[in-house]
Amino acid sequence: GVPGDVHDEQKQHDINFLLFKVYEVLXDIXLKXVA
């Protein structure tokens, strides 16, 4: 129940979201490059 733990979870969630967006963009670039 430490506020720091909540902050770490939120930061991890943000990082996962950013990675997901990066992979999404890379996939779009790859598809466009192939097509």
Swiss-Prot record:
A GO cellular-component term linked to this record: extracellular region
Expression across tissues: Hemolymph.
Gene Ontology biological-process annotations: oxygen transport
UniProt KW keywords: Copper, Oxygen transport, Secreted, Transport
Subcellular location: Secreted, Extracellular space
Molecular function GO terms recorded: oxygen carrier activity
Signal peptide positions (record): none
Family designation: Belongs to the tyrosinase family. Hemocyanin subfamily.
Its biological purpose: Hemocyanins are copper-containing oxygen carriers occurring freely dissolved in the hemolymph of many mollusks and arthropods.
Identification of the protein by name: Hemocyanin A chain
Organism: Cherax destructor (Common yabby crayfish)
